[in-house]
Amino acid sequence: MILQALTAYYEQLLAQGRVEAPGWDSKFKVSYELRLGPDGQLLALNDLRQEVPKGKKTVIAPRELPVPHRVKRASGVAANFLCDNTSYLLGADEKGKPERSRQCFEACAALHHKVLDGVDSPAAKAILAFFDSWEPDTAPTHPLLAEQWADLNNNANLVFGYESPDGAHWLATTDDAIRDAWQSAFDTSDADAETARCLITGKEAGIARIHPAIKGVMGAQAAGAALVSFNAPAFCSYGHEQGANAPVSEYAAFAYTTALNLLLADRNCCQRIGDTTIVCWAENAAPAYSNAMLMFFCGGAEARGVSESDLAAALKALSQGRPVSFLDDKLDPNQNFYVLGISPNAARLSVRFFLRNSFGQFAKNLQDHADRLSITRPAVDKRESLSVWALAQETVNQRSRDKNPSPQLVGDLLRAILTGGPYPATLLNGVTLRIRAEREVTRGRAAILKAYYLRNYPTELNKEVFTVSLNESSNVPYVLGRLFSVLETIQSVANPGINATIKDRYFNSACATPATAFPTLVKLAQKHLQKMSTPNEVHFSKQLTELMAQLPETGFPARLSLPEQGAFEIGYYHQTQKRYAKKNEEE
């Protein structure tokens, strides 16, 4: 299903003219042009690099050009056509293995002769003449190369160019005769390959023995990783080798890897959260869908020129099944949409999740998630919404050396949000542990508690207790949380500037075993009330009386269950935020 969807995406891009035909890589980083004359002599080394913005800076980066399809290299010698590194195009490098460099050059020369022999093109003849006359030993000291030799050997890719006698010049990759020759060679490259019915297209075709590499996944090998691979006999069946174990045609392997590499290279289609790299795309290949989706659940709208209010309005409309105009495009809620989560695993890629649904249903799931998360926020918290990463960070000790949340948690949380399913129990466990350890109920933690219990346990009682802001629920654990906040306030008012409050010593016991903590705290509050001015004493005494009146006649509960502790923590958070809001109004 994943490979079929990616292949269909490639074909949609091809139909729209946004990607090269099979046999060509659409975007490959090239740093220099080796410009040749009619006799194959090197005329110039042209720097193709350009300035590109990177954050707040501008850096020099290689130019992305369409080039002939790249071979997948392991440890052997394998040449690429027209575009490669110095080892293959010049026969020299700084790796200290001159014999291997010469072998690379000879392999590259043989490939170009195989493809270009008999081609009636001045550029093709110049390239062949270059390979026939070039002396690899002279490369490091060549007058046109010596000055840039260090840069050329710093993982730079070079491409052939041609200059005619009249001064006109062009890259060999744009020469029609050379392109036709390469296309013919590529189309017949699988003639000797084993044939079988392709699992993706359903057609009999030559099977790809090794699939092209996937690049751009953070944490994977720089040379790329494989989504489909068989690198040990234990993974093979019925005597098959490599790709024959799961027959995918050369065309389909090229199509799906090209599509995935393009998605990974586009920041509007790709986002990394923890160790999971997420790519998403619409069936019609319109970029506005993936751009909007990443803003919906990863944030960053303002950086893309979209206000938070416009983004929220678009999400709400789509969740209700209404089309909206967004980023100069019209978003159809019925458009099929895909979300793929992958993570690195040595030389392979692991699929964390693959989801397919209508864009409107994804929007509805995200809107429901946002509604469940909605809670009174402190004045100092300027965030309109909480991203997936922000939620996962609430489970992490920010004072520890490793501040990254569990990769498993991030993946499970993403899946729950996008599918509308139950939140993972590890999310609640992580937040509960942090509250107990730090005795702090932050906005993020309170929002998680609220969302978790509303989604996983949608009882009428939970709907009554877990609200956006303070409510007058008589639920005992909720009232106890409010009461604890009032007791803390009384202590702070009676002892201005106090370094530690009852929260630091009693929060966990009050939350888990109220009967052991609250009698002591209420007695302590009576002493604090005596220190206050009359207006304050009357005000807080009234608050205490109103809250105590909502408790059962049997007294404080001996213990609270985990859901009841969640209600306690929400009550504490609501009451505390009401106090801060009133304080801000007075100021």
Residue ranges, per PLM feature:
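Short metal-coordination and nucleic-acid-contact micro-motifs, chiefly zinc-binding Cys/His arrays
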Residues: 190-196
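Short, solvent-exposed secondary-structure capping/transition elements
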Residues: 207-211, 268-269
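Short Cys/His-rich metal-coordination motifs, predominantly Zn2+-binding knuckles/fingers
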Residues: 201-204
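Short microdomains enriched in Cys/His and/or Lys/Arg
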Residues: 209-245
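Conserved phosphate-interacting/catalytic interface
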Residues: 1-190, 235-587
